[in-house]
Every structure is written in structure tokens, then in C-alpha cells.
Amino acid sequence: KLRNQMRAEIIKLRQRINTTFMYVTHDQTEAMTLGDRIVIMKDGFVNQIGTPQDLFDRPVNLFVAGFIGMPVMNFFDGCKLELKDGVYYANVKGVEYKLSDFQQKALKANGQEPCDIVAGIRPQHIRVGEGKLSGAVEVSEMLGSEVDLHVNCGGDDVVMVLQTIDL
């Protein structure tokens, strides 16, 4: 409760003094809620600069993708980027997923050829019954308004977040 109150007070202070405000933190929640722009660093090097939403939606590498978001992004090794009739797909465990319009444009602009990839899927973007991956729920974490499910999908621990109102 105190941390939430302090974040709210810092936001109010920043609005009141109406000036550039630099806040250094290792806490992702503080960075996401307090920052208009965030600088993600590792080992003294800048990995990405962007708005909280940009970092969440379009991480530039695996470090940023795994750092931003709770629970952390699911990573799948041994996947393939495929190109069929001018459309890009990620082949994850034998299942093809059409990439977003943003991803399509970026890949086409770079003339990306099919290749091996590590696929990343946010727990909030996985839906029960909508895909073709199957698995067994091993752990269920009830958090009130949402539930985190840890699902064993062929040896991979896949985390998904469901809103309890949807259950």
C-alpha cells in the first residue's frame, strides 16, 4: 500500500512542478507507472529507449522482452520464421501464428528471409481454446481479478494470465 501511495505522490509532484524529472529505479512497476520514457540498460549499455507501452509491445531484444512485463514473457526456442505468399508466420511447436501488422511491415521493410527464431508470447496474449497448442495445467495462482496458469506444453512451462471475470 505504501509503495502505491508513494508512486501516486511522485506523479502528483511531477505534475505540480511541471519540469523534466529523472527517476532511477530497478523496479519495473515504478518505471512503467512513473516514466513517460524509459531507458532499459544492461551492463552499462542502453538496450532500448521508449514509452512504457512501446517497450511492452515492441521490445528490441530478448533482454528487454524478458525484463518488461509480469509475469515474464514466454520464450520458445527452436521456432521458425516462415514466409508464405508475402505473409510472415511464426512456427511455434509446429503451429503457425500470423504475425501482427506491425511485425509484417518491419520484416518486409528489412527484406527478412525465413530463419530460425526464438518466439516470445506475453502471458496476457494467450487464450484458452483459441490456439492449437495443448498442455496440462500444473499450477494455478489466484490473484483476485486474474489467475496465472502454469501450463506444461510439451516440456515448456507456459504462463498465461486469465481474467477471472472471463472464467
Where in this protein do the model-derived segments appear?
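Non-catalytic connector elements of ABC transporters
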Residues: M73, L83-L167
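Beta-strand-rich soluble domains of envelope-associated proteins
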Residues: R37-I40, L55, M70, S140-G144
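Residues located in well-ordered beta-strands
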Residues: T51, F63, D77-C79, S134-E138
